[in-house]
Amino acid sequence: MAQKGNIGVTTENIFPVIKKFLYSDHEIFLREMVSNAVDATQKMKTLAERGDFKGELGDLTVRVSLDTDKGTLTISDRGIGMTEEEIKKFINQIAFSGVIDFLDKYKDIANAMIGHFGLGFYSSFMVSKKVEIVTRSYKEGSKAIKWSCDGSPEFEITDAEREDRGSDIILYIDDDCKEFLDKLKIQELLNKYCKFMAVPVAFGKKTEWKDGKQVDTDEDNIINSVEPLWTKTPSTLKDEDYKNFYRTLYPMQDEPLFWIHLNVDYPFNLTGILYFPRIKSNIELQRNKIQLYCNQVFVTDQVEGIVPEFLTLLHGVIDSPDIPLNVSRSYLQSDANVKKISNYIMKKEAARLASIFKENRKEYEEKWDDLKIFINYGMLSQEDFYDRAKDFALLKDVDGKYFTFEEYQTLIKDNQTDKDGNLIYLYANDKEAEYSYIEAAKSKGYSVLLLDGQLDTPMVSMLEQKLEKTRFSRVDADIVDRLIVKEDKKESELAKADQDNLSQAFRSQLPKVEKTEFYVDVQALGVQALPVLITQSEYMRRMKEASKFQAGMSFYAQMPDAYNLVLNSDHPLIKNVLENENKECADQLKPVVSELKGLEARLAALHQTQNGKKPEEITQEEKDEVKTTEQSIEEQRTKKNDIIASYAKGNNVIHQLIDLALLQNGMLKGAALDSFLKRSVDMIK
């Protein structure tokens, strides 16, 4: 006899709430339905193991089937089933009180708690216009019953036909959710959410190619592995087992560097396998490759807040019943168990890395270029990881040798300490582009690190703070004798006027490059040093690089690149340029320089007469005279610079020296490079 009634909820709008609010991601209904079927089946197995069920277990496969003609999706199991009383208790009385209070509390959360409130079954109404349950309990004397509901608070219970224990959940798919009647869509969702569930899940039959088409076989299409690798004891597994499982998770990926098998049952439950992927370039860095499971049921691959941020770059699986199935990210981040899990994972990763470093340093060094991004990111983002990693983090020099922080400090402290007691770490970002600077540093007996990684700029800044009296400087930041200052700077013997004229000759012929500024400096570098070289300010270059990583530093990103063209006044070529300049320009410069000196003396006298006067005491005539004199000085300086520029324009040595410096820095390209090559040939002739 049929029974009708109302589902026990505190408000009649519970189903619209479920449909529109609680489940923002509609596709998870299938996960909930299959997960419930698996739970019922596992309970059946447990009853049999305990002796509470004496009958035959038989086939325990959970089956998912489509009937496109009827518009139904059915999830069937041979689990414990339900009696009529259990239907009324577990289905009709939703464990959900204070719906309005709940909405007020969680209205800003994208994915509210589902399983926590016992609402998993009701996710079926997100995609269904009607749901039927045909069930029969394993208990002796139980009869089959059918429960049906069309999404309103009303339900109906009737007698049904079912020979065996278990349940069929029949979903009559809504007209606006027809994609869930598509075989490929259901296969995709089962592969996503159910591929490691603990009971076999079948969806249709396996197919084979026969008579020119794909046909069904008699073999079930089992979509899951009931004993995934992370559930097994690590001591029973071989390296090849871990590699094969990685290939299952990530087809077409290179073999991982190594892996960590997680297994803890106190103070929380956690199992899993995390892999360090092999990364060939920074472009391949991808987050969210870790899959989170709850009792072998897929939850999410958005694991920020569950694992330390830097470990989101890893691949693999984490499974924990202590992480709720359906929660918001903000809930996860504040959950005490999640925080413990995150800290545990960080400690395990650090311990594994330390173990490999200690037991097989050669292998560790071979893998360092791939590991570096993970370890550096960890040290930058998590203080307690830095404290653990500083003993196994490595520095690599330009010759390919590896050192721990402590080893490298010991190596360079005698030769690379400046006059103020600072330890100077020299480095290059590109061995080829900075080759001559590297060689100049090595000729002084200095060691040069190779810092060519994506995170090396922020790492340098962090290490300068962590390591006492330490400074990093790129090899092209200054001339080699000024990179590590061991005595006061040697001044050029050239008179200031000669330095100014020499600087102007080179300045006038420097290329005009967009967003680039050149400055010219004259220094006494010694006869053996290069005649000309280009350096770049360590501070400004680092600020521009840091602007790529840090918000609020766009000011530096917009600034032009600044370079110093350093002229070695001790070099014969530079001396020759100056000597020729003075000879060629002397007659033209003499009257201009004389006039300029007179004007500068006059301006100094005018300023002298105004010293001590208040602004209102200075007459307009005096102000005009100062302004006129300043304009005249500027005109004479322009004349002087034009004379020098005219000389420099026709001087091939100046052009050649500038181009050589640009070429050394990879800054000579296109037409300028072509002109340099032609000029070089002409000069050789």
Language model regions located:
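GHKL (Bergerat-fold) ATPase N-terminal catalytic module, capturing the glycine-rich phosphate-binding loop
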Residues: M1-D175, E179-F180, E188, K195, ...
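GHKL/Bergerat-fold ATPase module in large chromosome/replication-associated machines
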Residues: M113, V131-E154, D174-K178, L184-K685
